[in-house]
Amino acid sequence: MFRPPLSNPTQKRTLLPLYANYQATPWAGFLDPDLDVDFDILPGTVMQRLYGEVFAPYTGESGTVPFGLSALFVAPKLGVNEVSSSGTGLFTVWVGGDQAVFEVLAPAFDIEATWPTTTGPSRVMLTANDKGRLTPEGVTAENVIAELIDIPSTDKIVVRLNRLDLSSTTDLAGGS
């Protein structure tokens, strides 16, 4: 179980595993030591695997693919850094199949995107924006990471990891 550090005990976790006991795995690795980003990495930020066990936020750069969802905070703006406080660079990314379901709280998803309704027969696939936040905008078969299951409120979404199963999707809702 991940817990916020004592330095910021009131900070809410922005990613909550709903179905993950057997459906998802926290994949251990390291945050890219050369990482230089001007945004916070929050639990729920889409991450890419650079090489070996080294991760960085997925920003949609050409030649990269999303790998999973961040489990930890590296958020200087919020005053929480669960990586540098350990001094090791250890980092964790949630990976899983299409049975892994997570609740994601804002601001860990793109609140400025045009979010479709989840009613009806269409599937709404998600990718990441240039800050690694989940978004329905710009989805392609190569960059999809999850499927939108529900939007319980304006600051909460429920997603199902869905990296590779596009066989029954004829149109990537929210895509280009």
Tell me what each language-model feature is.
Residues 1-176:
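Surface-exposed, low-hydrophobicity beta-strand/loop segments enriched in small/polar/acidic residues
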